[in-house]
A protein has these predicted regions:
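Intrinsically disordered, low-complexity regulatory regions
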Residues: 1-75
Length: 75
């Protein structure tokens, strides 16, 4: 199985949090961005554009955190 596919045959359903675990996402800002992107505009509270803005902000925060750490940690 390649790195883009995960075996979920034993699971009844897969939520966003399971996806983050399956793909070994360790960064909280990146996990937050992924959740925003997967459900952009579909949660009722915020529109599509606002979710994209917030996902971008989370990614920018991850990059800022990487800049604070030397040498850069390639995740």
């Amino acid at each position: 199985m390649n790195h883009y596919f995960k075996d979920v045959q034993t699971l009844k359903s897969v939520d966003v949090y399971r996806v983050l675990v399956l793909f070994d996402v360790k960064s909280h800002p990146i996990g937050h961005a992924i959740k925003k992107l997967l459900c952009a505009g579909k949660r009722g509270a915020k529109d599509y554009r606002q979710d994209l803005i917030e996902a971008k902000a989370s990614i920018e925060r991850e990059l800022a955190m990487m800049d604070e750490e030397e040498p850069h940690d390639v995740r």
